């Protein structure tokens, strides 16, 4: 089954119910939310989530297991000086996810800043090991990054290192097509890309996909999302992810720009579903 949706707002007054309703209007069957603004760790109380309204009216079309939560950008669990704050926050975020029964948390792996890249990778392993020990159920999906600044998680070697060191069924991967392209993976040579995933034994660990076109050339390390078929990757390549049997039942999430101050996820979802290989 194809699971295709987008990022939608989780905001007052309807929070979870409002996000699910918006997704269903877009003809989506999965969705991604932030439990607060992406640039902050401020959160509202569980009681405001409108969970019962979601269960009564929307859970049939978008089950809780297909609600993806994205961690905020501003935490850095790979930085030794900021790891404690990041861990404490993520433990609470997973508790909030448990309340709504969401299964997958997408996490930017962080940046090495003034430290060495290997130090940051090892700190991330320590941070995630601690978080796993203090939480239950939720699977943390490490997102592939574009290589902007001092980001880690920018190639399959680093992602494989993290997966193997953590060695947990609660650690997985979120592929981001824009980030992969900007990091240097030529998705247009789709079979070679899949072969590279398999070479590193990562295909089976992919549990979420962010499907975005890119405003930049291959290997730009910029991370600037474009609308579907309006960037350098193109509809033909991006649709292959949607219709790939290896990615059946894996939530595929659009994070594309607004057009004229509004999202066009409904249009993009139909474009992708209609573009069969």
From Swiss-Prot:
Keyword Magnesium, does the record have it? no
Enzyme Commission code: 3.1.21.2
Gene that this polypeptide is encoded by: nfo
For the ligand (Zn(2+) 1), the binding residues are: 70, 108, 143
- Which processes are annotated in GO (biological process)? base-excision repair
Q: Which PANTHER family match?
A: APURINIC-APYRIMIDINIC ENDONUCLEASE, ENDONUCLEASE IV ENDODEOXYRIBONUCLEASE IV
Q: Where along this sequence does the record place binding of Zn(2+) 2? A: 143, 176, 210, 255
Membrane-crossing residues?
A: none
Q: What class of enzyme is it?
A: hydrolase
Q: What's this protein's family per the entry?
A: Belongs to the AP endonuclease 2 family.
Q: Name one Pfam family in it.
A: AP_endonuc_2
Cofactor(s) required, per the database record = Zn(2+)
Name assigned to this protein: Probable endonuclease 4
Free-text function comment from the UniProt entry: Endonuclease IV plays a role in DNA repair. It cleaves phosphodiester bonds at apurinic or apyrimidinic (AP) sites, generating a 3'-hydroxyl group and a 5'-terminal sugar phosphate.
**What GO molecular function annotations does the UniProt record carry, in alphabetical order?**
deoxyribonuclease IV (phage-T4-induced) activity; DNA binding; DNA-(apurinic or apyrimidinic site) endonuclease activity; phosphoric diester hydrolase activity; zinc ion binding
């Amino acid at each position: 089954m194809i699971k295709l949706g987008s990022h939608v707002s989780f905001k007052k007054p309807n929070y979870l119910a409002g996000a699910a309703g918006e997704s269903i209007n877009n003809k989506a069957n999965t969705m991604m939310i932030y439990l607060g603004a992406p640039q902050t760790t401020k959160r509202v109380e569980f009681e405001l989530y409108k969970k019962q309204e979601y269960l009564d009216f929307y859970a049939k079309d978008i089950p809780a297991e297909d609600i993806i939560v994205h961690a905020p950008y501003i935490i850095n669990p790979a930085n030794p000086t900021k790891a404690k704050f990041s861990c404490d926050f993520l433990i609470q975020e997973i508790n909030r996810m448990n309340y709504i029964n969401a299964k997958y948390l997408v996490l930017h792996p962080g940046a090495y800043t003034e430290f060495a890249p290997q130090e940051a990778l090892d700190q991330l392993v320590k941070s995630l090991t601690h978080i796993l020990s203090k939480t239950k159920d939720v699977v943390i999906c490490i997102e592939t990054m574009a290589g902007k600044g001092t980001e880690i998680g920018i190639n399959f070697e680093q992602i494989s290192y993290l997966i193997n060191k953590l060695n947990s069924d609660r650690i997985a991967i979120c592929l981001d097509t824009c980030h992969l392209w900007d990091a240097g993976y030529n998705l247009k040579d789709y079979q070679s890309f899949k072969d590279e995933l398999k070479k590193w034994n990562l295909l089976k660990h992919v549990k979420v996909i962010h499907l975005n076109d890119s405003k930049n050339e291959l290997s730009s390390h910029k991370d600037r999302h474009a609308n579907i078929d309006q960037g350098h990757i193109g509809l033909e390549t991006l649709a292959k992810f949607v219709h790939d049997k290896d990615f059946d039942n894996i939530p595929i999430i659009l994070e594309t720009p607004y057009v004229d101050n509004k999202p066009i996820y409904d249009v993009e979802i139909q474009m992708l579903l209609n573009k069969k290989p």
